[in-house]
């Protein structure tokens, strides 16, 4: 073996002339002669073991090829001298796989099976050429099959626990593993010709001499590498690389693919009755952890064989095994286990009608996988019977005596794990529901379908004589899932996320938007934003929430509890997020800046609404007249002042909220600095129910002097009573009202006090500055000499009041200096 063989280093250089001497056995139909010119060597490109002054022997060329076949995937990628891409094909094309064949390759009948096609070379192909990647239909795997045994663990304690290859010529599904081999990321299905490429036709090598390609996983793709020189008119055949074969638990050499070790046949025995056969097997069947459980379908009539005639080294083909009587597989001890733990195994036995069966000690103490039982009983979508019976219970109930109580097997006393009597925690406190506490008093199983037999409940099946047993196991908490809650698709066996590995840490990616999370629980909460699921419902106002914490926070609205207080103005809030947002009004913090006009805001939702002014974005439209508005309040005001029919805006408001949340999740905002998004959500949800607040109501609510603010116009004369605002003016007024509502939280107790150095400048207002111009835009223009109001005309993009005016905090509106 050369210097680069095995695991100790880098294989020889790809242009080694020794590799040009491809070796084929004499009986091979693909034998290629080795000329003297091709056997010339170069000492700089071949290992010492494969070079000689006169030339290269056949054994030296074989060593070089073996070095390449046993190289790691990373070494193969580094030694690639040329990459052959697929031929570009226009889509759609039902024969895409055949049309993607690159140059020097053709598709014709296979040498092993004339009915199937294979890939052949039409010209010389050197060693070190890479083909690929493999193209096919990407299929994600579920959670149960994603985690596999790593390659290192499968080889612990001895030789590798190799599996039989489940295909004859080429696989129809290729598996993509994580770098460690402990997790299956996805599979690539190549059944459909319209969605795959030519690599699906490459046949697997049956013997090592015919192998000229290795299939390696590089990243998340499959590539083929030539491991030796391929002459013209040679059929391409592959086997898996060293690293990829270990991930698949396959042999690294192809010649053991179609053979299995000999199995021991049961010697002939006189026929026995069904009850005797089952009873004898029940006393002897034991299993070891991680071993494959036996499945006995019927008493076996074996053939008389001479055990001594078969040697230990004999290999029995699959066809020979199928022609003989079906043998019982021998229980093998895995290499990982050194001190096995012997325990009884729940064996599936057919119930023979009319024959009373007594199992004796076979089911004396079956060990119930309590953790798995709890997971399925709480997560699976239950059927109309609202019942989940464990597989052990179903098997036990199927084998019963003819005389005895209904549904109760004879001599069956299941023994639970040591954690069966442990307390399961306060589920009522977690879910916060009285209905859940009511469910705690219900037994998990009824007498009509007991899990382990014995009367009503589960006490009778535990050797308690049917008496009431106060263990917490037989009164498991049972959650009655409604149709609108807990619709996690992972309960149906189809996961809604993809597990990934980033920098040695496990990340969970959402299938819908590809966002990644470090915690699986956070991802499950995020998925509810796509499904619209709100499993937590308030019992007072029937409002629904995506998280339990949001429901608990919402309960403070009904109780009126406000535990968080502002140290500056003594205003109280129901949550810390509302308090942090409020403190920005005192310290002047405005972390959100407009990219267009450099306006700054205390909350991100304010900036989001402000940006709609520049972009003329109007997501809320009237279905009757087609007019569009910036905020839901503007559309609601339009419906009040016109004859247009009012519509439901919940969907559009929810989409608007999801857009803002999505921008925050994408990283545009960091930490808790994006402001009180919960207040914005409550505002959107309650916008349709909240009545319109005129500007006069704001003055009376906060005891503001009406004459000092609106009584004096630019001319110094007393203004007449303004007429009711127009629909466009109400839109601006509602926008300011909405901004004030979000800025102060869902419970307005009054605006924060203005700074101590601030004093109201009445002269400025008399000279036409200050707030009168604000309310001229909202309430109406200044009075003319004739005493009639002149309302300004608004064309194009309607501008809002000057949000930088220092009087706005006194009106309950946000202030932006």
Curated annotation (Swiss-Prot):
Superkingdom: Eukaryota
Post-translation changes: Ubiquitinated by the SCF(dre-1) complex, leading to its degradation by the proteasome.
GO cellular component assignments: cytoplasm; nucleus
One GO-annotated biological process of the protein: negative regulation of distal tip cell migration
Zinc finger region(s), C2H2-type: 508-530, 536-558, 564-586, 592-614, 620-642
Pfam families in the cross-refs: PRDM2_PR, zf-C2H2
Location (main, coarse): nucleus
InterPro entries the record matches: PRDM1_PR-SET, SET_dom, SET_dom_sf, Zinc_finger, Znf_C2H2_sf, Znf_C2H2_type
Domain SET: 103-241
Subunit text: Interacts with dre-1; the interaction targets blmp-1 for proteasomal degradation. Interacts with ldb-1 and ham-3.
Name of this protein: B lymphocyte-induced maturation protein 1 homolog
Organism, scientific name: Caenorhabditis elegans
Gene name per UniProt: blmp-1
């Amino acid at each position: 073996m050369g210097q680069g063989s095995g695991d100790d280093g880098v294989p020889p250089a790809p242009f080694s002339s020794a590799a040009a001497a491809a070796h084929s056995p004499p009986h091979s139909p693909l034998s290629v002669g080795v000329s003297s010119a091709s056997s010339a060597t170069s000492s700089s490109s071949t290992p010492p073991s494969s070079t000689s002054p006169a030339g290269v022997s056949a054994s030296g060329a074989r060593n070089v090829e073996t070095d390449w076949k046993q190289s790691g995937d990373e070494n193969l990628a580094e030694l690639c001298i040329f990459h052959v891409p697929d031929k570009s094909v226009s889509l759609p094309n039902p024969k895409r796989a055949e049309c993607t064949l690159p140059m020097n390759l053709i598709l014709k009948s296979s040498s092993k099976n004339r009915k199937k096609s294979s890939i052949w070379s039409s010209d010389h192909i050197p060693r070190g050429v890479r083909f690929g990647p493999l193209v096919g239909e990407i299929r994600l795997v579920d959670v149960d099959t994603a985690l596999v045994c790593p390659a290192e663990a499968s080889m612990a304690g001895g030789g590798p626990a190799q599996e039989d290859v489940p295909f004859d010529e080429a696989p129809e599904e290729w598996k993509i593993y994580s770098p460690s081999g402990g997790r299956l990321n996805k599979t690539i299905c190549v059944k459909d010709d319209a969605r795959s490429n030519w690599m699906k036709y490459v046949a697997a090598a049956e013997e090592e001499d015919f192998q000229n390609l290795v299939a390696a996983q590089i990243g998340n793709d499959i590539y083929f590498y030539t491991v030796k020189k391929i002459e013209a008119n040679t059929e391409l055949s592959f086997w898996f690389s060293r690293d990829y074969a270990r991930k698949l638990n396959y042999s690294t050499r192809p010649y053991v693919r179609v053979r299995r070790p000999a199995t021991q046949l049961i010697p002939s025995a006189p026929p026995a009755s069904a009850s005797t056969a089952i009873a004898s097997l029940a006393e002897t069947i034991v299993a070891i952890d991680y071993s494959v459980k036996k499945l006995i379908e019927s008493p076996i009539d074996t053939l008389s064989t001479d055990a001594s005639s078969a040697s230990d080294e004999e290999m029995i083909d699959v066809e020979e095994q199928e022609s003989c009587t079906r043998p019982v597989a021998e229980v093998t001890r895995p290499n990982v286990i050194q001190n096995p733990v012997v325990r009884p195994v729940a064996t599936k036995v057919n119930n023979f009608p009319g024959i009373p069966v007594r199992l004796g000690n076979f089911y004396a103490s079956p060990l119930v996988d309590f953790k798995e039982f709890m997971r399925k009983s709480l997560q699976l979508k239950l059927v109309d019977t609202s019942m989940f019976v464990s597989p052990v219970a179903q098997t036990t109930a199927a084998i019963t005596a003819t005389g005895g109580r209904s549904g109760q097997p004879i001599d069956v006393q299941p023994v639970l794990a040591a954690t069966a009597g442990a307390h399961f925690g306060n589920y009522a406190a977690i879910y916060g529901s009285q209905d859940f506490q009511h469910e705690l008093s219900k037994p998990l199983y009824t007498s009509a379908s007991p899990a382990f037999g014995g009367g009503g409940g589960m006490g009778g099946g535990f050797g308690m004589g049917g008496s009431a047993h106060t263990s917490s196991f037989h009164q498991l908490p049972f959650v009655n899932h409604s149709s609108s809650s807990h619709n996690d698709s992972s309960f149906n066996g189809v996961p809604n996320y993809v597990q990934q590995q980033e920098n040695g840490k496990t990340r969970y990616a959402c299938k819908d938007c590809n966002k990644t999370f470090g915690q699986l629980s956070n991802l499950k909460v995020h998925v509810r934003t796509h499904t619209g699921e709100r499993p937590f419902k308030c019992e007072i106002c029937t409002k629904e929430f995506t998280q339990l914490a949001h429901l608990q926070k919402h309960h403070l609205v009904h109780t009126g509890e406000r535990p968080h207080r502002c140290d500056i103005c003594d205003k109280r809030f129901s949550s810390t997020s509302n308090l942090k947002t409020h403190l920005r009004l005192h310290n002047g913090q405005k972390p959100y800046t407009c990219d267009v006009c450099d306006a700054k805001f205390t909350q991100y939702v304010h900036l989001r609404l402000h940006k709609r002014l520049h972009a003329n974005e109007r997501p809320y439209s009237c279905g009757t007249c087609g007019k569009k508005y910036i905020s839901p309040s503007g559309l609601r005001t339009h419906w009040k002042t016109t004859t247009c029919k009012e519509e439901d805006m919940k969907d559009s408001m929810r989409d608007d909220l999801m857009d803002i949340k999505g921008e925050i999740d994408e990283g545009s905002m960091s930490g808790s600095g994006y402001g009180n998004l919960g207040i914005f959500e409550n505002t959107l949800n309650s916008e349709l129910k909240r009545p319109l607040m005129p500007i006069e109501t704001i003055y009376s609510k906060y005891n503001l002097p009406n004459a000092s603010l609106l009584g004096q116009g630019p001319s110094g004369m007393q203004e007449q009573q303004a007429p009711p605002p127009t629909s466009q003016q109400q839109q601006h007024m509602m926008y300011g009202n909405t901004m004030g509502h979000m800025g102060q939280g869902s419970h307005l107790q009054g605006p924060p006090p203005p700074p101590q150095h601030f004093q109201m400048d009445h002269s400025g207002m008399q000279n036409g500055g200050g707030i009168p111009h604000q309310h001229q835009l909202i309430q109406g223009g200044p009075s003319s000499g004739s005493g009639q109001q002149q309302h300004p005309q608004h064309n194009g993009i309607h501008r809002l009041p000057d949000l930088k005016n220092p009087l706005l905090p006194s009106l309950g509106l946000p202030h932006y200096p």
